[in-house]
Amino acid sequence: MIIDGKNFGIDCFHSARIINCKNKSKRPQRYSHLAHALSKVKLTGHVMEFGVWQGKTLKVISDHFSNHTVWGFDSFEGLPEPWFMMSSQSGPRHPAGKFALAKEELSDVVNQFAKRKVNLVPGWFNQSIVSWLKDNPGVVSFLHIDCDLYSSTIDILTLLNSRIVPGTVIVFDEMYPWNNLERYDLWEQGEFQAVGEWIRTHQRTFRTLYRSEHQQCSIEVIV
């Protein structure tokens, strides 16, 4: 389905092919969806992940692009602000700082990619992307957005907008709880909101590729 700012809504993604996985838990769902999205990348360009954490999905991406440099962006200090998932809770499901790595854990992440063509870029996205853009010309062919928050997602899409071109494949990790395998009442205030604002502000068009039975979905940019 072709999506633009006029017809954007969560119903648009219901037409995407569902990637079924016998194991209904989150991690196998994510990996299966990610592998299918990676198979759709035909464009030559930068391969980027935002939200590395322990490096598990970055490893999947670098396995696929074994002869290509892969960029992994993360503050490694955890969420910059609380991530509220449920409207009925007294506090955030994930407070600011959640997903931070201790020094030993960060060393493990660095070491696991030491012999791979992976460049880790530490820092908050609104700063690290600006610095990265100055030194790295060229378009983005694949983008994995796994940063949970509206604020982080809109920073990524806005700052990389000129590098996101027809053929760019983008995977979103927390778009919508399709089968309610994990409660996410406030999905409209997360990645979904950022994508809607991005396509309307910059007059972008995309087609849906896949969605998982969890929260993931993928798109290919047309305009």
Q: What residues fall within each predicted segment?
A:
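Conserved SAM-binding loop and adjacent beta-strand
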Residues: 19-32
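S-adenosylmethionine/decaboxylated-SAM
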Residues: 4-22, 40-223
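Conserved alpha-helix/loop element of class I SAM-dependent methyltransferases that forms part
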Residues: 29-45
